[in-house]
């Protein structure tokens, strides 16, 4: 899925929750392949200065973290897609 389609999907998702999207930004990172020391399974890990997120196939759009900036504004970080959404409530 490309970024444009992901953005459309996220805007639709946010609109259903009655939020107005201010901005959607893609957060670049470095993807590296790692091996789980217990199972031996390979997985991709996305790293940069601020994030260390395991990317797995079973994460979906509702796997997100929300952070309030103030009374009216917040952002959501969708870990699987590595996208940050700034929005008003």
Where are these regions (language model features)?
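Acidic, low-complexity, intrinsically disordered interaction modules
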Residues: 22-89
